[in-house]
């Protein structure tokens, strides 16, 4: 059965109708929920589904308390495939892998080498139950760490790096912790502490289960939607084309599983080739045929996936089997038939229901407990499995505490006594962002995908701008990780300086019309410039990167690749009749062509459209680029033309001032301007940051942003004000207040906070708090996502379902409404702007306008502490040198301080451009330390 592209889009998550008119100013009304009664005795920001606590490691954790089997509030409309309607998930991960832990107790592990995938699918109808749980039996009674567990109580804790489940009943307690050890090891540790609460000695068996049937996030399968295929079933059918092979591991203490590819199903291959031919004959508004010039080693799917293993660390296994079908039998995961007997030692299974099952026998006296430890993971090419197993055998009892200690020592921290919950939120965001890293062996770099619906449902890593934004907070703590993300993106640069919109599978450029985007190189130039300024690592510019795309792919220096990107922006993308950078198929907003114009108009729009956003951003980025090159030793002959482009873009943006705000986009002669009658948030902050707006325009603009975009929303500024611009005529359609038709986007509000921070610190701080998980949980406590993680866009108060995100068929944002890295990265980077931080040629400029009596911004690179005594801080870039610290304070505040110290020595005050300047030696591990006191 086939389905037309029009029907597909008409039924997609972007196809929504009807409008909801809400009050102009945000206030509590019958349509806008107040804090629920269940919230009143919980820490701020807990919401309905549990509460925030401080765990035994002095780290934040979320105690999940909802019984999703009985509570109707747990249900979300989803398309079956990845998450169930009542499934709420938590991320555990390290730099190598990421796993999703379910409120049902199971854990799926994502692994990206070869192609992004779950190593252990959850598809109970196919006999696949993910993993990370087990069964305790004394021959009569059974407890399970798969919810509800057959006990009297079942506790669930989402922690930094771990997922804890504690089930009690039948005279026993099982406390299982699944954690990803901090670092780069491709493994999870499962620690199971079993206690005998009865009055008699107990002979017990524990069976640890991890599945081994893959679920690849295949974009090839996603493309087959156009042929009427179910993407999730297509992916699961593809997994059956692999045969499993098992053998004992580590001297018989565990199991090793490998896979053999049997070839593609010929019928499926014909379907895919038909879809490709269809796109070739009849261009689609979103998808295109695959790039015929893609590298030979690129592939939509992983045809040689890694081996997986499960090992008992603290003692040999008492038994094992790979016969998952025989173990679960007709009782399934709730009542496995195999619990009635010892595991049979069968390692001959090859089918999709094969599994890794280990048994441990133990005898416990009354009141006695024992901890069993297992290691589950996958083999990285060129590494030794036995060495990894030995490492964790030695560290089994201490690995969780050691990992937690590492999490406490890394990352960005911010705290203020006036808002205690902020410290928790910042620590949590850093954890989620860092644990979102994986490793891509096509580019040979760590990468932080946007994830969420894009990776887990649609199957692509993109857009190219997104990992660059996610990496920015690590400038302050882990510059080597930033360099990996930069190298990943630099490797994507094509001979003409463009970048693929996204990557699917193993290095395959995403086949999409959005590949003809205009803005991607801007983000790369900006991110590299920020890296060089923050770390002083000018040598990075002369390091070489292996590019992967185009006939002239090969080694090139970072400096030359940036120049290639700049030429692409200025010569290929170029400018239109209004002097603004052209938009092409899209700028940041992927929907402008497909939602606001008809298919018949699209050719003109792509050729003639211009983006105020692109030019406003280019004015900032090109200026930053020129200054960075000058700092790195470039002469004026190279930078003067770039500075001229800065002025050209500023002038073009200034011409788009309406008297109230800046226009959004020129859609060509037929459609004219967007943004004359409505304010679009996208270009406004960049117009301020890039120097396009003068002082009076800035005041007017901030006032209108506050009134039109901020005051109407309790959870962050909306992207587009109400009005005629919300009328969409294209193939994609979204309801007002949703998606790119006025939703709430953290990635946009990050830039707004940055712009506000230099003008109105109180408004900037308020906007930061409104975009927090804590605020969302207070305003919309019964929407589970948005409490500890969230999507890249939330519905605004102007929508029918405020505080939620978009549903729809055949896929919707509600299908995977968490783990979007923008929700974690953007608040972190915005904090650096709230303290007025700017890296300049001579060092650091700080202009804090936060309305807080005291706060602490602490990172390995840079710190700023405000107290009743004054300010102090440090700066420790990679390169040791004499650096300048400029502290700009309001005159009334500055006059209170007379004592200045640099590296422990008192120095006289020196004013430069209205700021106190302090100069001293620092870097390469010895920080420049300074203080300004009364």
Where are these regions (language model features)?
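N-terminal secretory signal peptides and thylakoid transit peptides that target proteins
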Residues: 1-16
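Anionic coordination/interaction segments
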Residues: 21-466, 480, 488, 530-534, ...
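Non-catalytic C-terminal accessory modules of carbohydrate-active enzymes
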Residues: 109-168, 172-173, 183, 738-740, ...
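Aromatic-rich carbohydrate-recognition surfaces in CAZymes
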Residues: 135, 460-467, 471-581, 612-615, ...
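Hydrophobic, small-residue-rich alpha-helical packing segments that form membrane-like cores
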Residues: 162-163, 608, 616-617
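Catalytic cores of carbohydrate-active enzymes
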Residues: 207-209, 224, 500-501, 617-729, ...
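Active-site acid/base region of carbohydrate-active enzymes
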Residues: 416-435, 442, 477-480, 484, ...
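Carbohydrate-binding/catalytic loop surfaces
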Residues: 446-458, 501-519, 548-552, 578-607, ...
